[in-house]
Design a protein with these regions (language model features):
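Periplasmic/extracellular loop-to-transmembrane helix junction in inner-membrane transport proteins
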Residues: 7-43, 58-63
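Transmembrane alpha-helices
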Residues: 116, 123-126, 134, 148-177
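Membrane-interfacial helix termini and adjacent extracytoplasmic/periplasmic loops
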Residues: 16, 20-28, 61-65, 79-116, ...
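Glycine-rich helix-loop "coupling/hinge" segments at transmembrane-helix boundaries
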Residues: 173-190
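Transmembrane-helix boundary motif in ABC transporter permease subunits
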Residues: 40-70, 137, 151-155
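Short hydrophobic faces within alpha-helices
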Residues: 30, 55, 72, 128, ...
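Membrane-embedded alpha-helices of multi-pass transport/permease systems
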Residues: 5-12, 46-51, 80, 109-112, ...
Length: 190
């Protein structure tokens, strides 16, 4: 009954000629949703790569603890995080006398909220890839004269490529599903 009645009503709308479908509007909103999710996933994975590489190769226990705390945003509800972002922006605007009205309903705040929310997903993907790499791989590149960044580029990044792509897909899908943050922080006329 819970399936048959809604499907029969929808089929009745289709066959009776009642159409609420506006393909131009659907394409427009789908394009912006996919663009926003792709941009958010890109920045989440970029920050995740940076944090995990630093925590694995160049950090002490305090830095590792801070990076662990950065991953706790996934436990917060999206609505609480969005309201917290608005309060944080208001605090910055009031006390530091920045004019952040351009950012208050913009993509920058939305992307930052996505980074805070989904950093745990990106970190988990990158960390699982880092754990598969032998610890001496980076040391070998440093011994052969490559600097840290060149060693990361030549040795680590090719080995992490599949984890980066999988983590990016997971974050992309999570951002597409995240309605509270998007609805509360979206730009006007979006």
């Amino acid at each position: 009954v819970g399936f048959v009645i809604p499907v029969s009503v929808l089929l009745n709308f289709i066959f009776s000629g009642f159409s609420i479908i506006d393909f131009k509007e659907i394409f427009y909103t789908s394009f912006f949703s996919i663009t926003l999710a792709f941009t958010g996933a890109f920045f989440v994975m970029l920050v995740s790569i940076f944090l995990i590489l630093i925590s694995n190769y160049k950090s002490n226990n305090l830095q590792k603890s801070i990076i662990f705390l950065a991953s706790c945003g996934y436990a917060l509800p999206g609505t609480i995080l969005a309201v917290g972002m608005v309060i944080f922006l208001g605090w910055i605007n009031e006390y530091l006398h920045f004019h952040l009205s351009y950012f208050a309903g913009g993509f920058i705040v939305l992307i930052f909220a996505y980074i805070v929310r989904f950093l745990a997903v990106g970190n988990a993907s990158i960390r699982s890839g880092i754990l598969k790499i032998h610890p001496n791989a980076m040391d070998a590149s440093l011994t052969m004269g490559a600097g840290f960044f060149r060693g990361v580029k030549i040795v680590i990044m090719p080995l992490l490529l599949s984890n980066i792509l999988i983590g990016g897909i997971l974050v992309f899908v999570d951002i597409l599903k995240e309605l509270p943050i998007t609805l509360l922080l979206r730009p006007f006329n979006f």
